[in-house]
């Protein structure tokens, strides 16, 4: 939905710098998009003691929020959401972000009205565990045959596969076509 890759990568790089741990590449920072925070830290800060995870997250969030004004919807997303709503098609968000983080972004983008439901990493096991999608299915009275998981990362595709639903990978987000193709259904 939102082009947050530069803000996420910058937040991770600056958090590592402030804590005094080895920097990560932009590509590594991109690779964690979609995961829950507890799964992210071992990748971007592998030597950080678990007792420091909370501090790291606070520092990362501070830097991410500094980039908040630069966040924007990907081209065509608003039009697609309008078309889906006009057609009576239910939409939901399954994200690795926290509820607070999701609410902040979706409110800022002014698109809450286009979604029937949402679930975050602090409400269910993180991607690719199927609990997120299974919970959305149950809450909305839908079956696996009635939904499609759309995502821009391998974690989204793995989530769809784990839940047994059809997936659509979009290539304008965090990772390349070639990378996504390796995880196609």
List each language-model region with its residue ranges.
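Metal-dependent phosphoesterase signature
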Residues: 42-79
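Nucleotide-sugar donor-binding loop of glycosyltransferases
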Residues: 171
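Active-site neighborhood of HAD-like aspartate-dependent phosphohydrolases
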Residues: 1-28
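Substrate-recognition "cap/lid" segment bordering the active-site pocket of phosphatases
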Residues: 70, 98-150, 154-163, 177
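Helix-loop "lid/cap" segments that line or gate small-molecule binding pockets
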Residues: 15-16, 36-49, 105, 136-137
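Conserved small/polar residues in nucleotide/adenosyl-binding loops
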Residues: 178-185
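Short, acidic loop-to-helix structural element flanking the phosphoryl-transfer center
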Residues: 66-93, 99-103, 130
């Amino acid at each position: 939905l939102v082009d947050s890759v530069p803000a996420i990568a910058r937040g991770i790089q600056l958090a590592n710098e402030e804590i005094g741990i080895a920097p990560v590449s932009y590509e590594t920072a991109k690779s964690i998009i979609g995961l829950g925070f507890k799964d992210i830290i071992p990748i971007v800060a592998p030597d950080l003691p678990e007792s420091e995870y909370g501090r790291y997250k606070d520092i990362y969030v501070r830097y991410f929020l500094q980039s908040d004004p630069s966040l924007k919807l990907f081209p065509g997303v608003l039009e697609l959401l309008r078309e889906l709503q006009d057609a009576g098609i239910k939409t939901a968000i399954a994200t690795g972000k926290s509820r607070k983080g999701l609410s902040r972004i979706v409110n800022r983008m002014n698109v809450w009205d286009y979604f029937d439901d949402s679930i975050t990493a602090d409400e269910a096991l993180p991607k690719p565990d199927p609990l997120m999608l299974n919970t959305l299915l149950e809450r909305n009275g839908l079956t696996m045959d009635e939904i499609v998981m759309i995502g821009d990362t391998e974690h989204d595709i793995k989530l769809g596969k784990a839940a047994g639903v059809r997936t659509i990978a979009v290539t304008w987000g965090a990772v390349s076509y070639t990378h996504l193709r390796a995880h196609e259904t």
